[in-house]
């Protein structure tokens, strides 16, 4: 377990990747349920425990994975795993949930989430096809040991009707400061929802978009083959990316002085503040990331932006110090950590 919490990013997430100035990460999730087994929402705690033990026994053969049962870890540890996107908020909140986690942190097989099984792959930058291929391979390995709930007409049966069919959910984490600062983000979000896509904050449903970070996902999984769903998703994602590029060009062309003032104010706060909330830290770091992308500030890399965001979250921060911290203590240590990072340079 400790290997997963020593560093804020796994080895793959530290690598530079395609379009990583705008796309922080790509995630593929496959929802699966076990045949002839009551679905998760109506399972008792004892039923969840039995299912967890059963799936652990069946999937123990997965090579290169570590099995983590949530009941064995405290709330802060689970929160830190969630902050790294290795488990979902639902798994973090349930002691009878578990995860098979790959050594390189690119694959999570979640047990007792909304569905019995959720296979997740996470890669840096814009790598939709690669993430799907990886998830497909893990799905095939799991299917060797499990019989899935499947209907010839409907496809994979899932707890939520929106997941029935392929059970496929593709997501990209997008950094969209240009659209946000130009005021264009709201109409784009409305249009995306009309097209059947969801857009949320960093941790999915119910979370905010601090740092202008948005999670774009497909909503429809029924009635189309995986290849068509992915093609449609990639087309929409690339349209959003293009809109963000245009918004950034407009900002540089017409509002450069205002931008420079904003960036240096954020740098000053990060460099000298004694207390920083996680929300303010992310917002200010988002400004620095955009400044680097636009050539106004140098010595920055997209993985460093992502790494700092994880490192400054409450759970990971407390794991770093090895103790529970009050809100003010977290804000103090967060500010200290940012100052030390800037002292060492941004790269």
Swiss-Prot record:
GO cellular component: extracellular space
Keywords per UniProt: Allosteric enzyme, ATP-binding, Kinase, Nucleotide-binding, Transferase
Domain spans labelled Phosphagen kinase C-terminal: 22-247
Activity-regulation annotation: Appears to be allosterically activated by the binding of pArg-containing polypeptides to the pArg-binding pocket localized in the C-terminal domain of McsB.
GO molecular function: ATP binding; creatine kinase activity; protein kinase activity
Binding site for ATP: 25-29, 85, 118, 169-173, 200-205
Substrates-to-products reaction catalysed: L-arginyl-[protein] + ATP = N(omega)-phospho-L-arginyl-[protein] + ADP + H(+)
Motif RDXXRA motif of the pArg binding pocket involved in allosteric regulation, residue numbers: 330-335
EC number: 2.7.14.1
GO biological process: phosphocreatine biosynthetic process
Domain of life: Bacteria
Any Pfam family: ATP-gua_Ptrans
The family this protein is said to belong to: Belongs to the ATP:guanido phosphotransferase family.
Role of this protein: Catalyzes the specific phosphorylation of arginine residues in proteins.
PANTHER family xref list: ARGININE KINASE 1-RELATED, ARGININE OR CREATINE KINASE
Annotated HAMAP family: Prot_Arg_kinase
Protein name stated in the entry: Protein-arginine kinase
Species per Swiss-Prot/TrEMBL record: Exiguobacterium sp. (strain ATCC BAA-1283 / AT1b)
Lineage of producing organism: Bacteria, Bacillati, Bacillota, Bacilli, Bacillales
């Amino acid at each position: 377990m400790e290997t997963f919490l020593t560093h804020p990013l796994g080895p793959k997430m530290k690598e530079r990747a395609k379009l990583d100035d705008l796309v922080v990460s790509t995630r593929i999730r496959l929802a699966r349920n076990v045949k002839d087994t009551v679905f998760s929402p109506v399972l008792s705690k004892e039923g969840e425990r039995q299912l967890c033990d059963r799936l652990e026994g069946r999937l123990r053969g997965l090579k290169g994975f570590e099995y983590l049962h949530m009941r064995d870890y405290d709330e802060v540890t689970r929160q830190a795993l969630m902050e790294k996107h290795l488990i979902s908020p639902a798994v973090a909140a349930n002691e009878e949930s578990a995860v098979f986690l790959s050594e390189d942190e690119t694959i999570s097989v979640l047990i007792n989430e909304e569905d019995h099984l959720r296979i997740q792959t996470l890669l840096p930058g814009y790598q939709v096809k690669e993430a799907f291929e990886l998830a497909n391979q893990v799905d095939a390995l799991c299917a060797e040991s499990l019989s899935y709930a499947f209907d010839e007409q409907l496809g994979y049966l899932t707890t939520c009707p929106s997941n029935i069919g392929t059970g496929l959910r593709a997501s990209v984490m997008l950094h969209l400061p240009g659209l946000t600062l130009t005021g264009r983000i709201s109409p784009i979000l409305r249009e995306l929802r009309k097209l059947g896509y969801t857009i949320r904050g960093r941790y999915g449903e119910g979370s905010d978009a601090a740092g202008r970070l948005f999670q774009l996902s497909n909503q429809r999984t029924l009635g189309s083959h995986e290849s068509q769903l992915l093609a449609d998703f990639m087309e929409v994602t690339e349209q959003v990316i293009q809109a963000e590029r245009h918004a950034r060009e407009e900002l540089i062309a017409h509002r450069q002085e205002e931008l420079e003032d904003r960036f240096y104010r954020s740098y000053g706060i990060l460099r000298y503040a004694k207390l920083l909330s996680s929300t303010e830290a992310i917002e200010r770091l988002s400004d620095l990331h955009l400044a680097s992308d636009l050539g106004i500030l140098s010595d920055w890399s997209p993985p460093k932006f992502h790494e700092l965001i994880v490192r400054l979250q409450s759970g990971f921060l407390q794991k770093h110090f090895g103790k529970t911290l009050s809100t003010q203590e977290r804000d103090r240590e967060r500010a200290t950590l940012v100052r030390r990072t800037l002292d060492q340079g941004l790269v």
